[in-house]
Amino acid sequence: MTIAFQLAIFALIATSSILLISVPVVFASPDGWSSNKNVVFSGTSLWIGLVFLVGILNSLIS
């Protein structure tokens, strides 16, 4: 169970880092938002899902 928790934490950190870099780049580019809107929403949905997964796994480990 701790391996799954550690992998979920790693995925959350990696997703956060990717979104931290990609979202400002998408907003700064002139045509970026209209063409990359689905990617940003997918990444945000993944991030929210990982936050809930980490919370659930944390409650099971503690």
From Swiss-Prot:
One of its GO terms (biological process) is photosystem II stabilization. InterPro entries: PSII_PsbZ, PSII_PsbZ_sf. Gene3D superfamilies: Photosystem II PsbZ, reaction centre (1.10.287.740). Its main location: plastid. Keywords: Chloroplast, Membrane, Photosynthesis, Photosystem II, Plastid, Reaction center, Thylakoid, Transmembrane, Transmembrane helix. GO terms for cellular component: chloroplast thylakoid membrane; photosystem II reaction center. It is found in: Plastid, Chloroplast thylakoid membrane. It is a multi-pass membrane protein. The chain crosses the membrane at residues 8-28, 41-61. PSII is composed of 1 copy each of membrane proteins PsbA, PsbB, PsbC, PsbD, PsbE, PsbF, PsbH, PsbI, PsbJ, PsbK, PsbL, PsbM, PsbT, PsbY, PsbZ, Psb30/Ycf12, at least 3 peripheral proteins of the oxygen-evolving complex and a large number of cofactors. It forms dimeric complexes. May control the interaction of photosystem II (PSII) cores with the light-harvesting antenna, regulates electron flow through the 2 photosystem reaction centers. PSII is a light-driven water plastoquinone oxidoreductase, using light energy to abstract electrons from H(2)O, generating a proton gradient subsequently used for ATP formation. Belongs to the PsbZ family. This is Photosystem II reaction center protein Z. It comes from Acorus gramineus.
